[in-house]
Curated annotation (Swiss-Prot):
It is an enzyme of class 5 (isomerase). CDD domains: ADP_GME_SDR_e. Substrate binds at residues 168, 179, 186, 200-203, 213, 277. Pfam families: Epimerase. HAMAP family: Heptose_epimerase (MF_01601). The keyword NADP applies. It comes from Alkalilimnicola ehrlichii (strain ATCC BAA-1101 / DSM 17681 / MLHE-1). Its cofactor is NADP(+). This is ADP-L-glycero-D-manno-heptose-6-epimerase. Catalyzes the interconversion between ADP-D-glycero-beta-D-manno-heptose and ADP-L-glycero-beta-D-manno-heptose via an epimerization at carbon 6 of the heptose. It catalyses: ADP-D-glycero-beta-D-manno-heptose = ADP-L-glycero-beta-D-manno-heptose.
Length: 320
């Protein structure tokens, strides 16, 4: 069995879909389907079993058997960078991860979990070293806290453990995320509604729409996860991005080009985001490459085209 926590979410459901495509249906999904629309992400997938996230953690803490488990992909978390309830965030993102990590170590089960580029905050250097880690929000801190906790164990592991620091991920099956969905999702909706894409005016010394992020295709994130599963000798914390920052203007033009029409409107930079916004991110892939991973990552032109082609063919994952 392969366990995927957050398996009905954005990256998790794409992982389940790819596992199915590779012939794996022995997948246990763990999630919280209070928001039932997430279930649509799994409508075209086959799974072996499902557990609510609270029931699952109770199950493993009680040391009840789940049968042979090949690997745990831990993607379940509160990923809202605008959430400031620290107690809620730490319970969901830190304490849950800690319990699952020890459960896997006790059973020698590979544990591949989701960290985040939010740990870097406003830094201009994005290498996996403590001196560059200064999160700007409690979400980023909750991810950093677990990375710090894990580092204490890296020299004495019983099985593979990998944390992937995701940069700005986009792709199908993110429609349930609302305001936290990628800019591709929002640009697509805006174009359909008004014929315009809205971008922030300049900030932090960047011109209008020239803020830069490392936008990474969800399919590449999934391929990297499965590469890691095939390389159990690799453990550690690694960036997951393309290694190339691109402007929001460039991303907007990639979406406009797919639709064949549209204009850009620049709107004032929100007051509540000042001092809490990453105007520049770019994954340093040196450590990932040194670990032997030679996977190529899609540029935004390819990734956006693949994304919008996919959702055009599958209304259930269409931006709305």
């Amino acid at each position: 069995m392969i366990i995927v926590t957050g398996g009905a979410g954005f990256i998790g459901s794409n992982l389940v879909h790819e596992l199915n495509r590779r012939g794996r249906t022995d997948v246990i999904v763990v999630d919280n389907l209070t928001r039932g629309e997430k279930a649509l992400n799994l409508a075209d997938c086959v799974i072996a079993d499902y557990y609510d996230k609270d029931d699952f953690i109770t199950l493993i803490e009680a040391d009840e058997g789940l049968g042979p488990v090949e690997a745990v992909f831990h993607l379940g978390a509160c990923s809202a960078t605008t959430e400031w309830d620290g107690r809620y965030m730490m319970r969901n993102n830190f304490e849950y991860s800690r319990a699952l990590f020890h459960w896997c170590q006790d059973r020698r089960i590979p544990f591949i979990y989701a960290s985040s580029a939010a740990v870097y905050g406003g830094n201009s250097v994005f290498t996996e070293h403590p001196e560059h880690e200064r999160p700007l929000n409690v979400y980023g801190y909750s991810k950093l806290a677990f990375d710090q906790y894990l580092r204490r164990y890296l020299d004495d592991l019983s099985a593979q453990v990998v944390g992937l620091r995701y940069f700005n991920v986009y792709g199908p099956r993110e429609q349930h995320k609302g305001g936290m969905a990628s800019v591709v999702h929002h640009f697509s909706r805006q174009l359909r509604e008004s014929g315009q894409v809205r971008l922030f005016e300049g900030s932090d010394g960047y011109a209008d729409g020239e803020q830069r992020r490392d936008f990474v295709d969800v399919s590449d994130c999934v391929r990297l996860k499965l590469w890691l599963l095939d390389h159990p000798e690799v453990s550690g914390i690694y960036n997951c991005g393309t290694g190339r920052a691109r402007t929001f203007n460039a991303m907007a033009h990639a979406v406009i080009d797919w639709f064949g029409h549209g204009e850009i409107e620049y709107i004032p930079f929100p007051e509540h985001l000042k001092g809490r916004y990453q105007s520049y991110t770019q994954a340093d892939l040196s450590q990932l490459r040194a670990a032997g991973c030679d996977l190529a990552f899609n540029d935004i032109e390819t990734g956006v085209r693949n994304y919008l082609d996919a959702v055009a063919d599958a209304p259930a994952v269409m931006p709305s």
